Amino acid sequence: MRISKVVTKTGDKGETGLGDGSRVSKDDPRIECIGTLDELNSFVGYVKVAIADDGIITFLEKIQNDLFNMGGSLSMPGTEIETVNKECIDALEKQVDTGNSELPPLKEFVLPGGSETSARLHLARTMARKLERKLVGLHKNNPLPEQWLQYINRLSDVFFVLARKLQRAEGVDEKQWTHE
């Protein structure tokens, strides 16, 4: 589908169109998932502009394309395809394992923040978790490819490890939760 017109006025009464031509309420669980994918994708772009490492930028752009692929597939009910596969999940897991091997073990939860880049990545992590919850809800009545849930779960781990790794690279001490 190509966008040729931005203002269509077809959504002015609380409905939107899907790729198959059907109309649904803008609060439909499928639309919630598509919207949350869009939020996360936009935020990954916001993370990207704070990063100077070309390798990480390329990796984040791959993630953005994966998220767009999932959103496009979601817009065609009943035809959801495996837009992210085992190789995509393996790439995320490799990023987590590599990054985590460079970090000290955690004793407590990490307080989000510390540096601008780290704070953005922690927010992206929470957005990925939110998307995961919405996808699980949709999956209950509308089966989705299982790899989607795995991918989004691993994606939040990627953002967590990248937040820690980049904060450390920026020379900012990591603050951990001190419970009383």
Model-inferred region functions:
Residues 1-180:
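Phosphate/pyrophosphate-binding loop motifs in nucleotide- or prenyl diphosphate-using proteins
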